[in-house]
Amino acid sequence: MPKRTGDILISTPVSKVRRKLNFDSPYTSRAAAPTVQGIKRRSWTYRPMYRKPRMYRMYRSPDVPFGCEGPCKVQSYEQRDDVKHTGVVRCVSDVTRGSGITHRVGKRFCIKSIYILGKIWMDENIKKQNHTNQVMFFLVRDRRPYGTSPMDFGQVFNMFDNEPSTATVKNDLRDRYQVMRKFHATVVGGPSGMKEQCLLKRFFKVNTHVVYNHQEQAKYENHTENALLLYMACTHASNPVYATLKIRIYFYDAVTN
C-alpha cells in the first residue's frame, strides 16, 4: 500500500479519534471532525506537479508564449527620471534588431514579463518640507503606436482637478491604450516621520506581442503594434521626486519572423 503524507482515518476500539481523510486538500474543510495539524499543509506549493490536482496541471501557463520560440532574451533599461505632477512617460519595449541575447531577430516578439527595480527619492531641499508625496505608476499597452514619441500623460489620461490619483484613460482612447498594471509608492518629508526614499520591486506578467516595422533601431516610432509604456506622475503639485529605476523585460522571438 503506497505511503501517503495526508491525514488518516483512525477508528479502533482503543482509539475513538476520527480524523478526516483528505490528503492535504487546500480547500476548506466541510467536516467538524478534528484534523491532524501540519506545517503548510493547506498548500500544494512544495508538491511535485504529477501529485497536484488536475486543476493545477491543466491551467498552468506555458513557459514559452504561444507562437514563440526560445531562448528567453533580456533587455534592461536604466534611467533616472524627474517625476513631476504633469507626468512623464518611458517606452519599455525598445529592442534593437540583431542576433544577440538582448536583440530581436525579426519584427515580432512577445514580452512575457517585466521587472521594475529601483527607488523613488527626494533631494535635500524638498525632504525638509512637511508633505506626503505619492508616485503613481501606470504600465500601459499602446495597441496602435503613432508618431515619433509617446503621448504625454495629460493627453492619454483624464483627471479630475489635474490629480494623477484620479487618472483614467480618456474615452476616445480606450480602444488604443490599455492599463495593464497600476501601482504607487509613497515618500514623506519633514523633520518627524521622514521617509525620504521608497524602494520599488515589482514583477508582472504581461504577455504582450510587439510588432516592429522593417527598421532596426529601438525607437517608439518604429513600433506598429503593442508598444509597452510606463507612465509616472506624482500627486504633489509643487514638490517633484526622482525615480532611479532599472527596468528589465523578458521576451521571446516569434516563430513567424
Swiss-Prot record:
Gene3D superfamilies attached to this UniProt entry: 2.60.120.20
Highest rank taxon of the organism: Viruses
A Pfam entry, by short name: Gemini_coat
Zinc finger unnamed: from-to: 68-85
Cell location: Virion; Host nucleus
GO BP field: symbiont entry into host cell; viral penetration into host nucleus
Motif (Nuclear localization signal): 40-54
Sequence motif Nuclear export signal, residues: 101-122
Locus of motif Bipartite nuclear localization signal: 3-20, 201-248
Entry keyword set: Capsid protein, DNA-binding, Host nucleus, Metal-binding, T=1 icosahedral capsid protein, Viral penetration into host nucleus, Virion, Virus entry into host cell, Zinc, Zinc-finger
Subunit annotation: Homomultimer. Binds to single-stranded and double-stranded viral DNA. Interacts (via nuclear localization signals) with host importin alpha-1a.
Name of the protein: Capsid protein
Organism: Tomato yellow leaf curl Sardinia virus (isolate Spain-1)
